[in-house]
Amino acid sequence: MDIKNLSLKDIKFPKSWETKPSKIEYMQFVYQEAIDMKVWRKDNEIDILTHHHVTDLSRFFWPNADFEGLVLGAELMVWFFAFDDLFDGGFIDDNENEQYRLVNRMNKVFLEGTIEDDSTGAERMGYYLRNKVRAICGEKRQSTFHRFNSSCVQWVDSIIPFIKLKRNQKSLDFNLYIHHRKFNIGAIPCFLVSEIILDPMSNIECFIWLDSRWIKMSEIICEIIALVNDCVSYEKEIKENGAPLNSLKFIQIEKNLNLQESFEYISNYLNELINQYIELETSFIKSYKPITSNYNSNFIAIVEHLHNMSFANVSWSTQTPRYLSQTQPFLELRRNKKIITKIYDLKNK
């Protein structure tokens, strides 16, 4: 693949959306939890590096959270990876019956609060996460708990349809892809974790988060995160499998564009989304400012976190070894992979 000089700076995020990641002390705690639930294999080098990669997102997504908040975010990331890897890691290949069986079992974890005797590590982490969120929310915050559960079920249910898109890749349409991907990216459960972390006393009226503008704002951020992920993972996916479900790739085919033109198309689309989001956010905050005066700081923190997460995804992507290489088409990712040796001596803790 020819090296291009593309830049993520062509995506015009407002300066106010930028954040700095927090510290990493929570990683060891969550690693031990995942070992106990048999999500990871103890002292396995691959699992240790995977754990760092997966849980590192928490400090970028929730930079202002306390230790418990960072742990909750990291647990969610481990669950995402552990379940998705059953499908992406080649464990069940194209066995559709097994795919539906795993989806139905995981849905029962969140819908019924039950777990099978022969549970997988992903199911154990999901069960633990569900019960933990329920305990945190208590009786006063049942709406938050149920919306978190619903968002997790929605993500689980998105996996098989997204797999099926791969089988129809020759006729893949950008709008169809975006519709599926904004749920499959897994950002909506993250938004609910933000609400749990940033409004601990549940002072904010729950109906506010049912406003159609807030729901649309959430979906826009999902789209932004999904498309940025396609950009930063483009080279990696091309090398691994030809990137059949990468928008930067299939837009080239669909519209007969080169890589530069395809990225220009996506960056323009992203910039339109950002502008649309800003308009909605301004209207949303203005509408509820009079009734949120008693807890305005929490309300604003949750709203700001929604857009901050989209830039945090960019920040994380430009430093994770997962995407760095000397042949990256994106200038911000074009350097040697970092060797993770001093993050945590997880084997000896």
From Swiss-Prot:
Short sequence motif named DDxx(x)D/E motif, residue ranges: 84-89
Coiled-coil region: none
Enzyme Commission number(s): 4.2.3.-, 4.2.3.161
Motif (NDxxSxxxD/E motif): 229-237
Keyword Metal-binding found: yes
Gene Ontology MF, one: (3S)-(+)-asterisca-2(9),6-diene synthase activity
Pfam families (UniProt xref): Terpene_syn_C_2 (PF19086)
Catalytic activity: (2E,6E)-farnesyl diphosphate = (3S)-(+)-asterisca-2(9),6-diene + diphosphate; (2E)-geranyl diphosphate = (Z)-beta-ocimene + diphosphate; (2E)-geranyl diphosphate + H2O = linalool + diphosphate
Disulfide bonds: none
One example of a Gene Ontology biological process annotation: sesquiterpene biosynthetic process
Keywords: Lyase, Metal-binding
CDD domains named in the record: Terpene_cyclase_nonplant_C1
Induction: Expression is detectable but at low levels in vegetatively growing cells and increases during development induced by starvation. Expression is highest during slug formation (approximately 16 hours after induction). Expression decreases during culmination (from 18 to 24 hours after induction).
Free-text domain note: Contains several highly conserved motifs that are important for catalytic activity including the aspartate-rich 'DDxx(x)D/E' motif and the 'NDxxSxxxD/E' motif, both of which are involved in complexing metal ions to coordinate the binding of the isoprenyl diphosphate substrate in the active site.
The protein's role, per its UniProt record: Terpene synthase that converts its substrate farnesyl diphosphate (FPP) into the sesquiterpene (3S)-(+)-asterisca-2(9),6-diene. Is also able to convert geranyl diphosphate (GPP) into a mixture of monoterpenes including (Z)-beta-ocimene, allo-ocimene and linalool.
UniProt record similarity statement: Belongs to the terpene synthase family.
PANTHER family: TERPENE SYNTHASE (PTHR35201), TERPENE SYNTHASE 2-RELATED (PTHR35201:SF3)
Protein known as: Terpene synthase 2
Organism: Dictyostelium discoideum (Social amoeba)
High-level lineage: Eukaryota, Amoebozoa, Evosea, Eumycetozoa, Dictyostelia
